[in-house]
Amino acid sequence: MFPKRQGIIVWLHSLKYGKQLRKFGNIHYISKRLKYAVLYCDMEQVDHVMKKLAALPFVKRVEPSYRPFLRLEFESKGEKEKDSPYPLG
């Protein structure tokens, strides 16, 4: 239903070119202090967009976001850890 999206972190030399990143995807965040932008595009186009962004003269570095590949379901604590002989508080 929804297309798979992936974030791309773009490190910039100057922020005045931040608006030019709109044509590569949806800009999610721009950090003025650290001079980077986070933009999202379709997963199928990530490699193509990263190559185009890296070729721009105002871009220092381009990194993909690894969030889609991380496991976000966490397991609960085991029974041993729940029944501690030393109560806290």
Swiss-Prot record:
Places the protein is found: Cytoplasm
InterPro entries, per database record: DUF2129
Family to which this protein belongs: Belongs to the UPF0298 family.
GO cellular-component term (any): cytoplasm
Keywords associated with the record: Cytoplasm
Name of the protein in its database record: UPF0298 protein GTNG_0961
HAMAP family in UniProt: UPF0298
Matches recorded under NCBIfam families: PRK02886.1 (NF002777)
Organism lineage string: Bacteria, Bacillati, Bacillota, Bacilli, Bacillales
